Amino acid sequence: IMDIVGRYKKVLTDIVGNRVFAYRAGGWCIQPFDKIEKALKKHAIYLDSTIFHGGLNKSKTHYYNFSKTPNSSQWRFNSDPLLDESSGFFHEIPISSIKLNPFFFWRLVFHKLFPSNTHKQFGDGVAAKASWLYFLRLVISRSWSVVSLDGFKASFLQRAYSEYKKKSFDDF
């Protein structure tokens, strides 16, 4: 992991010509953090934007549990990204999230089966495959989801902004 972080940071630095200091874990899989903590510290990567309040996935390939995040728009931490420590080395700026009704995911299935130009995704990336158990949980119970500019989730932006302001977070 140490070697991978170092090589990839160098490639990114060569491309952008500036200091690289931020990170987001693919698939939101930042836990257990001790697997990457030393590599990020060694390579001066201190800003993370992986966590989203309420996020939960316990599949064989993707694990994260963000059910107990600090009630803040940003925080510092050391070895646990869910523990607010004012003198922490790392700085977390969480992804905005909102709580969704299962009906949203049924509509998402409909839009996947019958695509339109209204909610197009950017780029050519492909989301990680979700387990059937994860999908089942989404369509039968309320769950948390990230807010995005991409695709159908862009419809959350106004609601997320309103909720953010209600919490008196003023660093939007």
Model features per residue range: what roles?
Residues 1-27, 83-85, 91-93:
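CE4/NodB-like, metal-dependent polysaccharide N-deacetylase domain
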Residues 18-19, 169-171:
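Short coil/turn segments at beta-strand junctions that form active-site/ligand-binding loops
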